[in-house]
């Protein structure tokens, strides 16, 4: 093949991985029969076979031998459904640390060894990185961002994706409690249409949903507790038809750490509603005196007391240092305080915010929105207008830039070099830990702000991640 055509096909493959194509940006397409050269007709199915070929021989047996009794029972249930073409829909429930991800890997390696085709997705890019070949459910299944009760996935029956779904033996969908139930319902309708089996859930495909309802539930802006519960998968008509499986044994506590075990039990009790003081509301929790600190400065010094030794600290330091808070405003305040404790020179990057007028929106108020007001907005999904950084500080990526390379929403990184338009980062979490990546300034148009219009602001798409 002509070298120029090889480069065109190389870039075309990158576009396909992001759900786009060369025609979208008016770039030339490959003129030679690439399908024939690679003996493939569907690149999505070919990717699944590539996963099978990459698996070490006998790896599935090693994983199966490590399953505990609860995991083995769930493993056998799912395996029977796939091998007998039963099309059962499961929900795997279990708190963090009970081995849900390990069970997913064991299922995937076993079925890949048998030549089965499977799709692994999760609600977020970070969770997807923990699954074999994992991607976000929205990107794979083309789920609308603005989901409604009657929404369907944007998948044509004649597309390569539809062909992949039609021959899929198992779908694993992790962290589904975080997503609106309409997402699963939309995909259910789409699968029925693709498989021409309107009477079978998900068109007769075996599906394993997984997650923990003790953790983050669907985010409903300004929603009441009742509205949040109504958005959960448990309120979906699909829930009654699911086979429930539960894991309870915390694999992280099998080394005898008594203090950690006590904390895990206390934390689980909060989720079960067992830590509510008598005579108080359900939103209040009793903390032990040993968990409390005297002041904000005491908390910062307790967690980040060695920042003056930053050049000598390794990546494990930031793995073990985190402060959690539910409010973005508190995150902003604490991050500013802690960042000033880092050695080195502070550098500030400014975004270029402006209002974009949408078709059909005629609101005189939009013309009165000043740049200062736009700069003052603080949302969890967009970076700050003024981004303060120092070399050596941790940051968190806010969008899925390159999931296959471990750069996705929620990935934590260390800033190793600061340029005017590009930053060099060292990956701290995810599937590509230890790799170096380069992040440019990017324009972003948020869709969920309390404005009648959107605005883009070219800047680096991450936030300081000291919390």
Locate the predicted segments by residue.
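RecA-like helicase/translocase P-loop NTPase motor core
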Residues: 2-467
């Amino acid at each position: 093949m002509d070298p120029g055509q090889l480069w065109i096909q190389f870039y075309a493959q990158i576009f396909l991985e992001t759900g786009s194509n060369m025609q979208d940006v008016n770039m030339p397409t490959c003129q030679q029969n690439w399908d024939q050269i690679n003996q493939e007709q569907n690149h999505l199915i070919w990717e699944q076979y590539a996963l099978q070929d990459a698996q070490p021989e006998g790896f599935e047996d090693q994983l199966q031998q490590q399953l505990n009794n609860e995991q083995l029972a769930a493993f056998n249930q799912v395996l029977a459904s796939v091998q007998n073409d039963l099309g059962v829909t499961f929900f795997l429930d279990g708190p963090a640390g009970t081995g849900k991800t390990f069970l997913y890997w064991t299922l995937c390696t076993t079925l890949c060894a048998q030549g089965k085709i499977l799709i692994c997705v999760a609600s977020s890019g970070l969770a997807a990185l923990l699954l074999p070949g994992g991607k976000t459910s929205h990107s794979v299944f083309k789920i609308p961002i603005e989901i409604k009760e009657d929404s369907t996935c944007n998948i044509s029956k004649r597309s390569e994706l539809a062909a992949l779904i039609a021959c899929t033996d198992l779908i694993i969908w992790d962290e589904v409690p975080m997503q609106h139930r309409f997402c699963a319902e939309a995909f259910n309708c789409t699968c029925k249409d693709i498989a021409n089996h309107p009477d079978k859930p998900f068109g007769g495909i075996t599906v394993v949903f997984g997650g923990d309802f003790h953790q983050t539930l669907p985010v409903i802006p300004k929603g009441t507790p009742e509205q949040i519960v109504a958005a959960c998968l448990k309120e979906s008509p699909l829930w009654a038809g699911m086979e429930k499986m539960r894991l309870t044994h915390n694999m992280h506590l099998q080394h005898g750490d008594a203090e950690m075990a006590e904390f895990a039990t206390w934390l689980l009790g909060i989720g079960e509603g067992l830590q509510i003081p008598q005579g108080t509301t359900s939103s209040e929790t009793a903390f032990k005196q040993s968990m409390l600190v005297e002041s904000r400065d005491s908390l910062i010094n307790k967690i980040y007391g060695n920042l003056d030794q930053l050049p000598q600290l390794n990546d494990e330091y930031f793995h073990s240092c985190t402060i959690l808070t539910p409010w973005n405003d508190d995150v902003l305040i604490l991050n500013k305080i802690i960042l000033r404790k880092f050695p080195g020179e502070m550098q500030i990057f400014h975004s270029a915010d402006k209002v974009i007028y949408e078709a059909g929106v005629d609101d005189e108020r939009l013309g009165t929105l000043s740049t200062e007001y736009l700069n003052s907005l603080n949302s969890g999904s967009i970076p700050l207008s003024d981004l303060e950084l120092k070399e050596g500080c941790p940051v968190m990526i806010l969008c899925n830039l390159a999931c296959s390379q471990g750069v996705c929403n929620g990935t934590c990184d260390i800033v190793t070099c600061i340029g005017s338009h590009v930053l060099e980062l060292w990956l701290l979490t995810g599937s590509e830990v230890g790799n170096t990546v380069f992040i440019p300034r990017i324009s972003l148009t948020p869709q969920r702000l309390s404005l009648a219009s959107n605005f883009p602001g070219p800047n680096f798409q991450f936030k300081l991640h000291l919390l």
